[in-house]
Design a protein with these regions (language model features):
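Unchanged
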Residues: 1-254, 364-366
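Left-handed beta-helix
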Residues: 1-4, 198, 206-372
Length: 372
């Protein structure tokens, strides 16, 4: 493909509360065996993009460990490959990334060394499948300066979490508001953009000269009347995990057969780093209904409408309902978990009860397994 990829994975999201105290949003576990960034990386690979840069910053250790080998997404190649960039203090720069445009600016040498004519920019915290070649063909046909991938939200969804845009009959963007207090449209930006590489370099350098650091505010919105910026509307599944509720809903969506089949049975595939573990074990007396249970787990109790990640131990007489249990959690005997997200590497003590009565509850308990 005639494009290089950039995945923005360095942002800090306070709306994820305790879940991002240990990891970046892009490293959040999804659907039992995946990380959020796997979807963007798989889309890049399936679109035959040979060179991809991932820009990381906050709580990047877990994310960097996940990306330590590029072979899982077929980027282990002599030409191109997967590049992971973190903020670097140099003689000319002493700052962390001050925004999305600044993150690209601090790694502009990467783009200048590339030869591909186009750049695809996406975030690492969205769950979706996409062939970027179709978007690029649209971008070229429209003779656009920038193409923004967008979609219509379903009725009742909160549009104020996203950039809101309005387009004319030719799909040219006429108005763009970033996370407004009141949404005047249900068409949102998905945070996926296509732009010519030389033009991106010029816009980023010009923004840096004026101390402007945000790609949406200081480039898209600022130049919407000066540049030909078009929208490319999608209808397939897309979800951004920017809040605890959105993260919970996204994982629960994978309990729906149509969503699960779309991602895991229909080609192209979604790839992730592989961990060699035995299959989940269901001991006598275990009851599992409408749930995803990942490898390495041992089930002795009841699991209903839940997603269990790798190496989860469910004790005797435990009941888990409508919950997400992250990696390497030990649930003692006679525990009751409902409408909760249990953080990874936790020990839930026996004979305890956790219920999210007013929404999704994040459960973090002291991990006594590692106490000396």
């Amino acid at each position: 493909m005639r494009a290089v990829g950039i995945i923005l994975a360095g942002g800090n999201n306070n709306k994820m509360r305790e879940l991002t105290q240990r990891r970046a949003v892009a490293a959040m576990p999804i659907a039992g065996s995946y990380r959020a960034i796997d979807f963007a990386l798989s889309n890049m690979s399936n679109s035959h993009i040979q060179k991809v840069a991932v820009l990381t910053q906050y709580n990047a250790r877990s994310l960097n460990e996940h990306l330590n080998s590029s072979k899982w997404w077929d980027f282990g190649r002599k030409q191109g490959g997967l590049y992971v960039f973190t903020p670097t203090i140099t003689a000319d720069n002493g700052y962390w990334y001050r925004g999305t445009a600044d993150a690209i600016y601090q790694n502009l040498d990467f783009l200048k060394r590339c030869h591909e004519p186009y750049v695809i920019i996406t975030s690492g915290d969205a769950v979706y499948k996409m062939d970027y070649n179709k978007v690029l063909e649209y971008h070229i046909a429209k003779k656009a300066d920038i193409t923004v991938v967008c979609r219509d939200l379903d009725q009742g969804e909160d549009a104020t979490r996203f950039g809101i845009l309005k387009m004319n009959e030719n799909m040219r963007i006429e108005n763009f508001e970033e996370k407004p207090m009141v949404a005047n449209s249900n068409t949102i930006s998905t945070g996926i953009y296509i732009i010519r590489r030389r033009q991106l370099i010029d816009l980023i350098e010009h923004s840096a000269e004026e101390d402007r650091y945000d790609f949406v505010t200081d480039i898209l919105i600022r130049y919407k009347n000066l540049k030909k910026i078009y929208g490319y509307k999608i209808k397939d599944y897309w979800s951004n995990i920017s809040t605890v509720d959105a993260y919970y809903k996204t994982n629960m969506d994978f309990l729906k057969p149509e969503v699960r089949n779309y991602f895991f049975k229909q080609l192209p595939s979604i790839y992730s780093k592989v961990t060699d573990l035995p299959p989940a074990k269901y001991n006598p007396g275990a009851v599992v209904k409408n749930s995803l249970v990942a490898s390495g787990s041992i089930i002795n109790g009841t699991v209903e409408n839940s997603v269990l990640f790798k190496k989860v131990f469910v004790g005797n007489n435990c009941v888990i309902k409508n919950s997400i249990i992250l990696n390497d959690v030990y649930l003692g005997d006679n525990t009751y978990i409902e409408n909760c997200i249990v953080e990874s590497r936790d020990t839930i003590r026996a004979n305890t009860r956790h219920v999210g009565e007013d929404g999704v509850k994040v459960v973090i308990e002291k991990n006594e397994r590692y106490a000396l």
